[in-house]
Amino acid sequence: MQRLCAHALILVLALAAFCEASWKPHSQLQDAPVAPGANKGQEPLRMDRLGPASHPRRQLGLQDPPHMVADLSKKQGPWVEEEEAAYGWMDFGRRSAEEGDQHP
């Protein structure tokens, strides 16, 4: 019985943590843009407008999504070429089909 209670408690705590991370008030859901390009003329959605920030958000600081996307786009390096070379073997099915067509 104690084991069942412990598992139930862990489940409830895990669900509460996930619900807190994905929860938005209903009023903010109505203001959210429907499509990615729907708010082109408007100011970007800021984290500080969402209300009081949770502890993890305060630790991360306030960054606009365009800044985060720009930072990610800068992180292209020599590993991209290495990945292309490493994944070159994945087209073996196409090569096998071409080799089969060459033999009468």
From Swiss-Prot:
UniProt entry keywords in alphabetical sequence: Amidation, Cleavage on pair of basic residues, Hormone, Phosphoprotein, Secreted, Signal, Sulfation
InterPro entries listed in its UniProt record: GAST (IPR039236), Gastrin/CCK (IPR001651), Gastrin/cholecystokinin_CS (IPR013152)
Keyword GTP-binding part of the UniProt annotation: no
Propeptide residue intervals: 22-58, 96-104
BP-aspect Gene Ontology terms: G protein-coupled receptor signaling pathway; response to food
Gene Ontology cellular-component terms listed: extracellular space
Main location class: secreted
Phosphoserine PTM positions: S96
Residue positions, PTM Sulfotyrosine: Y87
UniProt PTM: Sulfation enhances proteolytic processing, and blocks peptide degradation. Levels of sulfation differ between proteolytically-cleaved gastrins and between tissues.
Family designation: Belongs to the gastrin/cholecystokinin family.
Descriptive protein name: Gastrin
Organism of this sequence: Ovis aries
